[in-house]
């Protein structure tokens, strides 16, 4: 048992450095090509001329597509192992290391160039990859899946500063057959990754800064639960739209470079209306939480960002949709809150409360993981007083979504790439 805890600690450290490496590579490319040192792609897009804002995501997609197509042609005669931690957990726990690194590099290109896709997907992949590499050298084969799970949880903890949610992500979403006793090493890896990540970044701040002064009362619980119902209906719709967009891009029968370039071009066109469509949505979420905009502004940015996310994910841009889903949920919750605010005197607080609820419940509706989704929002924002209400709302959203759409976003992803 102590051997496992020691290995879990090492895996957590490796994962933290893997995440930090991707983050610093991203900052370097942003500085080199976008002359941006703020760490915000929205700021980068704002400072670019319109033609550069239009073409940059397309060029990034083209470069990533050429990289992926070139690697595919180079290795077409080789047997293929999984290049995704979800696939590796469902098979024999082995990775195609070179292909996974190429996929991560392609993700770096599309993320840095502004595509509306999550950078955290590549971070978690690299963390799981580092764990797998260590495990194959120093642990028996029957433990490989456990250490990949630890690496993925640690990567999520380092990326989102949410170790408990990262651990439950593994338990609820990826490793449902995992025995409860195996959660110990997963939690150790996640916590160690967070601590090492804090040391690397010289900060232990929460991922999102929120000033919510509301005391949750009976009326607020009713609003939170109703938001859960709304998210339970919106989750399957979002998954259906993502499926439809993917099929639409595939039906065009374009080569990968042109398919990714088209997705990037759509993002570029949308960014002419608002630069907020660039990136995974982190900075836009933070700005909304700091000062909730008016109803029409939220609606406009929401529609543009939704189309950008659908274009990026549908075109096959390598990356995650976890953080973009958080923004979509926030916008849905805030739109609902702004509508209700017309009848309540404390409309600002309701908008903020339901925005946070929307983040958690849409995440639960798309992942079918209500406990993880609840803890994720609480850990990212520090608003633990919302825990009881969010848990109820997330369970409701998950049940409704599962009834309407059998597969979660991750099962849908696995089926699409199998």
Swiss-Prot record:
The way it spans or sits in the membrane comes to:
Multi-pass membrane protein
Known InterPro entries for this protein?
A: Cl-channel_core, Cl-channel_volt-gated_ClcB, ClC, ClC-type_chloride_channel
Q: Name one GO cellular component term.
A: plasma membrane
Offer an example of a GO molecular function term for this protein.
Answer: voltage-gated chloride channel activity
Main subcellular localization, coarse class?
A: membrane
The residue ranges crossing the membrane are 5-25, 54-74, 146-166, 168-188, 222-242, 258-278, 291-311, 316-336, 352-372, 380-400
Localization terms from the record: Cell inner membrane
Alphabetized CDD domains for the sequence: Voltage_gated_ClC
Keywords of the record, alphabetical order, are: Cell inner membrane, Cell membrane, Chloride, Chloride channel, Ion channel, Ion transport, Membrane, Transmembrane, Transmembrane helix, Transport, Voltage-gated channel
Cysteines engaged in disulfide bonds, as pairs: none
Hydrolase found in the keyword field: no
What GO biological process term is on the record, naming one? response to acidic pH
Q: Which HAMAP family match?
A: CLC_ClcB
The UniProt entry's sequence similarity note says: Belongs to the chloride channel (TC 2.A.49) family. ClcB subfamily.
Q: Could you tell me what this protein is called?
A: Voltage-gated ClC-type chloride channel ClcB
Source organism per UniProt:
Escherichia coli O127:H6 (strain E2348/69 / EPEC)
Gene encoding the protein: clcB
């Amino acid at each position: 048992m102590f051997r496992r805890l020691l290995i879990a600690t090492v895996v957590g450290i490796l994962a933290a450095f893997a995440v930090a490496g991707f983050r610093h590579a991203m900052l370097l490319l942003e500085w080199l090509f976008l002359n941006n040192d703020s760490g915000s792609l929205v700021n980068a897009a704002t400072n670019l001329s319109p033609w550069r804002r239009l073409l940059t995501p397309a060029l990034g997609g083209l470069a990533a597509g050429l990289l992926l197509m070139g690697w595919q042609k180079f290795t077409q005669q080789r047997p293929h192992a999984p290049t995704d931690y979800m696939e590796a957990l469902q098979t024999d726990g082995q990775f195609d290391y070179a292909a996974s690194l190429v996929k991560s590099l392609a993700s770096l290109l599309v993320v840095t160039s502004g595509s509306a896709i999550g950078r955290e997907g590549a971070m978690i992949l690299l963390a799981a990859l580092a764990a797998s590499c260590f495990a194959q050298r120093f642990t028996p084969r029957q433990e490989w899946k456990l250490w990949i799970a630890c690496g993925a949880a640690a990567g999520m903890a380092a990326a989102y500063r949410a170790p408990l949610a990262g651990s439950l992500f593994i338990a609820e979403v990826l490793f449902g057959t995992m025995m409860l006793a195996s959660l110990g090493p997963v939690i150790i890896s996640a916590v160690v990754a967070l601590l090492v990540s804090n040391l690397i970044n010289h900060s232990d701040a929460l991922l999102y800064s929120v000033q919510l002064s509301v005391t949750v009362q009976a009326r607020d619980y009713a609003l939170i639960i109703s938001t859960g119902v709304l998210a339970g209906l919106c989750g399957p719709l979002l998954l259906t739209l993502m499926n439809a967009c993917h099929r639409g891009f595939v039906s065009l029968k374009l080569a990968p470079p042109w398919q990714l370039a088209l997705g990037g071009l759509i993002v570029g066109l949308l960014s002419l209306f608002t630069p907020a469509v660039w990136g995974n949505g982190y900075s836009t979420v933070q700005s909304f939480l700091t000062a909730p905009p008016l109803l029409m502004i939220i609606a406009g940015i929401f529609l543009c960002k939704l189309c950008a996310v659908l274009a990026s994910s549908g075109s096959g841009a390598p990356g995650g949709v976890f953080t973009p889903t958080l923004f979509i949920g926030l916008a849905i919750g805030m739109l609902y809150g702004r509508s209700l605010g017309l009848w309540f005197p404390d409309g600002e607080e309701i908008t903020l409360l339901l925005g946070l609820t929307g983040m958690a419940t849409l995440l639960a509706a798309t992942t079918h993981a209500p406990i993880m989704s609840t803890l994720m929002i609480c850990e990212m924002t520090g608003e633990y007083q919302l825990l009881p209400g969010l848990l109820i709302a997330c369970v409701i959203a998950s049940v409704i979504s599962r009834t309407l759409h059998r597969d979660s976003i991750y099962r849908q992803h696995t089926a699409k790439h199998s």
